[in-house]
Amino acid sequence: MKQRSFLSILCFILLAFGVASVSAQTCIENRKYFTPNGTYDSNRRLILSSLPNNTASQDGFYYGSIGEEQDRVYALGMCIPRSTPSDCFNCIKGAAGWLIQDCVNQTDAYYWALDPTLCLVRYSNISFSGSAAFWEIEPQYLVLNTATIASDLTDFKNIWEDLTSRTITAASAARSTPSSSDNHYRVDFANLTKFQNIYALMQCTPDISSDECNNCLQRGVLEYQSCCGNNTGGYVMRPICFFRWQLFTFSKAFHNITLATPPKPPMNVPRPPSVGHGANTTDNDSRGVSAGIVVVITVPAVVIVLILVVLGFFICWRRKSLQRTEFESDSDVSTTNSLQYEFKTIEAATNKFSKSNKLGEGRFGEVYKGKFSNGTEVAVKRLSKVSGQDTKKFRNEAVLVSKIQHRNLARLLGFCLQGDGKFLIYEFVLNKSLDYFLFDPEKQGELDWTRRYKIIGGIAQGILHLHQDPQLTIIYRDFKASNILLDADMNPKISDFGMATVFGMEESRGNTNWIAETFVYMSPEYAVHGKFSMKSDVYSFGILILEIISGKKNSSLYQNDETTTAGNLVTYAWRLWRNGSQLKLLDSSIGRNYQSNEVTRCIHIALLCVQENPEDRPKLSTIVSMLTSNTISVPAPGIPGFFPQSRRELDPLSEGLESG
């Protein structure tokens, strides 16, 4: 402890004499790596080189991808609103160049560049649009000014907290243009003294939700406060959000703000050091700071100080950065403790698991609505003993799953253990599950084609996120309409991870004798042999697409007689497709308000998903591309799995569909 304090003193003295240049570029470690000069590297260089033009010409925000399969590179470019095209172009170009130069083999990296405007460049080997997963917000980096606020400025803390609080609120509020960099952006200022302002800037990527933006910015502000609350400025950066405050304007972001007029600065009072990136510290903005703000460090014995500086230089240099602090997640123990709820808290929230709070019941337990004392609404799942996990495995998997965050996944907030009882606490989703609307003739009309198409795309994004999580791979194995929740805006959220098998990074196949999924959604290899893989989820997703389009259950077709193979939704869709009358599959409650090309493409994709051979089914990344781009060619589907091979000549068009 004494040694750490001594090192801190040495580093502080050294910093008083000058500030090391700190880069805002981050090559994310502990991910996959690529081979330099290979196909992935070529695609990375190609998309990053095109990013300056694409971003500057598209209102300061661009997201795209290039390449195929494992060599595909996703990239994002973003400038703050009202940046000139020239500044935006140069900022993105500089940031992209730094990433190419410094991140020699990391598949995921980002750079918040500060000059000539503020901009973000990021690339990855997985799609990150709309993602606020745990690795998007941890770890993050903090850079600070070394000078501290004068002790006589007693109102500073209140003024600073009020400024950051209202800036978070304004920045996280969604705009009407979600694809523009103007979404989730705010600059503001407050008067500290008659002649001195405080300036704050906050920005999130425009593709995340307001709650996700608010959460990210709140974390940044709290971490800055706990670390460096008395310093005269700094910034916190993450892949999805950025927070900076200073006693001077910066990044040409404050053109429309009336600035306080500083008095003539006294002699020999140094202004605070600039926080730049790389070797470029040029900033033409106003940087005058009154003498009352900066604490001047006086050293009575200059010789002693110089000796300490020389001694401390090497030690501080070995710590890699004099001003950057990486906040990593706590140990596994503390993470577990932060997620574990006391039983009395859960019991009180659910009114002792009263019948009036019960939302539903499935094979693996009952679900209750709960409300904590702070007003937060949650869904509490009380697992039945058939779930079969031992306590240690249950706790470990709960911690892992809680780290997975995406707008199309119902977030696991924590868990509870009480004797033999196990409980999972999820975020509460306002609307009920998809099947509540989809299979009820009186409610089907609330799901027009636009909403259904959006639901299909959202589910695909959610599954892709589960399959491509860099920390673990989850094969869900329980896709069905009742496990898709709908929020207030009818956005889908995949729920109930109690069935999911958690794998290590390299393992993607497994076997089980426990065939627990609803049979009508099962892939042939899973139902017959108990084998599952990512392609098993693809098969189930294909069934779900057909149900969403038709408003019918896969099991809703009837059997003609005891000798005739039972028809189902898959066989019916295939026969309609083969006869060129696929639009007959569409739910009649939709009427004529639909795009026939979208419906046809979704049926086409669904039939590819339900192919008998897993190798013939597309990957989720390919499915997402097919759904989002009409320029991608879609191969012709073959006969689906579980098709009644012996009765191919049976005329299915005479078979009716019953209500689900």
From Swiss-Prot:
<feature type="binding site">
    <location>
        <position position="381"/>
    </location>
    <ligand>
        <name>ATP</name>
    </ligand>
</feature>
<comment type="similarity">
    <text>Belongs to the protein kinase superfamily. Ser/Thr protein kinase family. CRK subfamily.</text>
</comment>
<feature type="topological domain" description="Extracellular">
    <location>
        <begin position="25"/>
        <end position="294"/>
    </location>
</feature>
<dbReference type="InterPro" id="IPR008271">
    <property type="entry name" value="Ser/Thr_kinase_AS"/>
</dbReference>
<feature type="modified residue" description="Phosphothreonine">
    <location>
        <position position="518"/>
    </location>
</feature>
<feature type="domain" description="Gnk2-homologous 2">
    <location>
        <begin position="137"/>
        <end position="250"/>
    </location>
</feature>
<keyword id="KW-0597">Phosphoprotein</keyword>
<feature type="domain" description="Protein kinase">
    <location>
        <begin position="353"/>
        <end position="632"/>
    </location>
</feature>
<feature type="compositionally biased region" description="Pro residues">
    <location>
        <begin position="264"/>
        <end position="273"/>
    </location>
</feature>
<dbReference type="GO" id="GO:0106310">
    <property type="term" value="F:protein serine kinase activity"/>
</dbReference>
<keyword id="KW-0723">Serine/threonine-protein kinase</keyword>
<dbReference type="InterPro" id="IPR038408">
    <property type="entry name" value="GNK2_sf"/>
</dbReference>
<feature type="signal peptide">
    <location>
        <begin position="1"/>
        <end position="24"/>
    </location>
</feature>
<keyword id="KW-0325">Glycoprotein</keyword>
<feature type="glycosylation site" description="N-linked (GlcNAc...) asparagine">
    <location>
        <position position="256"/>
    </location>
</feature>
<dbReference type="InterPro" id="IPR002902">
    <property type="entry name" value="GNK2"/>
</dbReference>
<feature type="domain" description="Gnk2-homologous 1">
    <location>
        <begin position="25"/>
        <end position="128"/>
    </location>
</feature>
<keyword id="KW-1133">Transmembrane helix</keyword>
<dbReference type="InterPro" id="IPR017441">
    <property type="entry name" value="Protein_kinase_ATP_BS"/>
</dbReference>
<keyword id="KW-0675">Receptor</keyword>
<feature type="glycosylation site" description="N-linked (GlcNAc...) asparagine">
    <location>
        <position position="53"/>
    </location>
</feature>
<keyword id="KW-0677">Repeat</keyword>
<feature type="region of interest" description="Disordered">
    <location>
        <begin position="264"/>
        <end position="283"/>
    </location>
</feature>
<feature type="glycosylation site" description="N-linked (GlcNAc...) asparagine">
    <location>
        <position position="125"/>
    </location>
</feature>
<feature type="glycosylation site" description="N-linked (GlcNAc...) asparagine">
    <location>
        <position position="230"/>
    </location>
</feature>
<keyword id="KW-0067">ATP-binding</keyword>
<feature type="modified residue" description="Phosphoserine">
    <location>
        <position position="482"/>
    </location>
</feature>
<keyword id="KW-0808">Transferase</keyword>
<keyword id="KW-0812">Transmembrane</keyword>
<dbReference type="InterPro" id="IPR001245">
    <property type="entry name" value="Ser-Thr/Tyr_kinase_cat_dom"/>
</dbReference>
<keyword id="KW-0472">Membrane</keyword>
<dbReference type="Pfam" id="PF07714">
    <property type="entry name" value="PK_Tyr_Ser-Thr"/>
</dbReference>
<keyword id="KW-0418">Kinase</keyword>
<feature type="glycosylation site" description="N-linked (GlcNAc...) asparagine">
    <location>
        <position position="191"/>
    </location>
</feature>
<dbReference type="GO" id="GO:0005524">
    <property type="term" value="F:ATP binding"/>
</dbReference>
<keyword id="KW-0732">Signal</keyword>
<feature type="modified residue" description="Phosphotyrosine">
    <location>
        <position position="526"/>
    </location>
</feature>
<feature type="glycosylation site" description="N-linked (GlcNAc...) asparagine">
    <location>
        <position position="280"/>
    </location>
</feature>
<feature type="glycosylation site" description="N-linked (GlcNAc...) asparagine">
    <location>
        <position position="284"/>
    </location>
</feature>
<dbReference type="InterPro" id="IPR000719">
    <property type="entry name" value="Prot_kinase_dom"/>
</dbReference>
<feature type="topological domain" description="Cytoplasmic">
    <location>
        <begin position="316"/>
        <end position="660"/>
    </location>
</feature>
<feature type="modified residue" description="Phosphotyrosine">
    <location>
        <position position="426"/>
    </location>
</feature>
